[in-house]
Amino acid sequence: MKLTHIPLLAGTLASAFSFNTFASDIVSVQFSDGRPAVTGVEAVNNALNPIGVNVVTVDIPEAARPLLAASHRRALTKAEHGALIAAFNLSQGELLEQARLAGRAPAVQGGGVATEETGVGPYPKVYDLMALDERTRSAVLGKYGRMHVNSAEDGTDIDEVMTVVSGGPFRWGFTLKDGSIARFQIDKVGLQDKAVRISYHGLGMHAGLMDAKQGLLVAFAHGPRAFTMRYQADVPHAQLLGTNPWADVGITLPPTPSKVQ
């Protein structure tokens, strides 16, 4: 489908972003090479912008607040997922702006279309950690928690925009230009906090750790019509693909699903 505005809920505020000092204590980056950790949006972006990754904070629309409160007690319904996507909707222009802020040209000129992981389903989608049983949680950790890239069969990159709107922590690993790993973390987003949005691209090697018991993430991805998640690819520092970026800090991961390339 073409990326256009999803009709917003009545009374929903536009999802404006800002560099909010109140997020200073919930976003941070630690480095695998032992350099000092950094905290706060500005410092995080100084570390991650060189690899095309950018972080902003986002005002919570009033219409979304009852959903976020409910997410602390139970898994949300499919209809509530749709309402949450509408509340945090991003138009094609807004998605392109996220890439621009990260210093990237879009993977597909003009932004392309809402993409989907082959065999998994299309974006946008909601990751609701309260909805995961132990078997599913293990599969999610084993799949997304290892370093990987996302690309179409012809090698086309994708653009990804993830907004943590409740709960956590949520963690990502990114490969820096020198081959070290930057471990980005969004600590728990509370009901009175702003959401945190991160933009990155699929061929920038990364991993995502969603091991919290409660949390909501609204995910957009765009570019080609479909992509595949890969643990083997001709990219810089390819020897890191499939590895666990949190192994040296004592976090173990389940086995990798065999169907992932």
Where are these regions (language model features)?
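Boundary at the C-terminal end of the N-terminal hydrophobic targeting segment
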Residues: T21-A23
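Low-complexity, intrinsically disordered activation/interaction regions
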Residues: D25-V44, L48-G52, L68-A69
